[in-house]
Amino acid sequence: MSTICLNMIVKNEASIIVDTLTNILANIHIDYWVIADTGSDDGTQSVIQTFFQQRGIPGELLQHEWKNFGHNRELALQGAQGKTDYVFFFDADDRFEGTLALPEQLTATIYNFYLTNMVRTTRYPRRLLVKNDGSCEWVGVLHEVITAKNAATSNETYVEGDYHVISGRFGARNQNPNKYLDDAHMLEEAYAQEQNQALKRRYAYYCGQSYRDCNEPALAAEWYERNIELCSKTGEEVRFSLIALGSEYRKLNDSAKTLEAWWNAYNAAPQHAEALGLIAEYLYVLERYSLGLEVAKKATTLPDPLPHATLFVNEPVHRYVIWYELGRHAVKLSLCDDAYASAKHLLNQIEHSDALNNFILSILEALKGHIERDTFANGKQIQHRIAAMQQLQTDDTRTKHQGMLNWFMQTFVSAPPQ
């Protein structure tokens, strides 16, 4: 069985670090630990040492002066080198959720784990487990990444399973009210000094993200544009950057540039439906229903993206938004078949909200004739899904819900005669 060293950098995480380490040990067998503290004054160091002493797990606490994320993660990695077969990275405010099952014998150079945000809407891979033989290194001052020193001789894979790591925002760094502005300034400086084009592109993108997060859409758009200039014309990086760019132009009320960015995002990766979902939603706001319907219909024909082949998967867009937009545009255009298809699809998804349930019920209430003309089995399935609805917070939704159940009781009393 491959041995694993836990490798972290921490500062002032005394209030959460026990929960963090407990969560890790519940999911990963840790044989050794090397954690670097970068200047805690809240007793984080002693909390960590006591935690591992009580569990009989050997390890080392290092003290490093803070410079930047890539530099300090690399120092911590060097401190762990050779202590085990593999090294596992984790942030103090991240948490495993679900059931993780690592292979007993690890062989790849790099293992990606699947992460999600705190509201569980976006899924993406991150490299968290690598060979502990000096074959990998950290790069980047912020939003750093672990990379193989020799890509030709390394291999990378993904840890599949019914789990994810929730990327938290409750650690000490996130208590800084100027975090995103500080990050943007650091990334601007790094961009100006960096000669490596891949890192320069990465800094530009995350600088845009930081300005987005401190509500500076004009500056965010400027940095996304710089990032896009350095990207290839097709693929995931430019697709996601163009989606982000369009969102900032929308905040600036520039509809032409918003749609241009999102159309370019779709053209950069035409197998991906996310940009089309955003376009369809915006066309509804602009009251361009015919075009919006065609865009939404196209989006519904595209496959769900594979998490390991996509930078970030916006799951609600694929599960709900494109079908919701199909339904909204169809209602405006009085296209009953499309509206009915939308409602049936949405009804078969995990419940999202009272508002979406209200929308589904409104369509089905108006299209009872479609239900009657559908197969008996489909009609009963619709009845069962409506009966199972839980998110019924408003009086209007509850009234529609009860009305549909009463109608079903009168209409679908028993199976049709054979």
Regions from the language model: what does each represent?
Residues 18, 42-51, 99:
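Acidic helix N-cap motif at the loop->helix transition within catalytic regions
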Residues 206, 244, 278-281, 285, ...:
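"A position-specific structural signal for the A-helix of alpha-solenoid helical repeats
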Residues 74-86:
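Active-site nucleotide-sugar/metal-binding loop of Leloir-type enzymes
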Residues 23, 36-48, 65-66:
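A conserved acidic beta->alpha catalytic loop
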Residues 12-28, 32:
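Short, well-formed alpha-helical segments that are part of the catalytic scaffolds
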Residues 71-77, 94-222, 232:
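Catalytic-site signature of metal-activated, phosphate-bearing donor transferases
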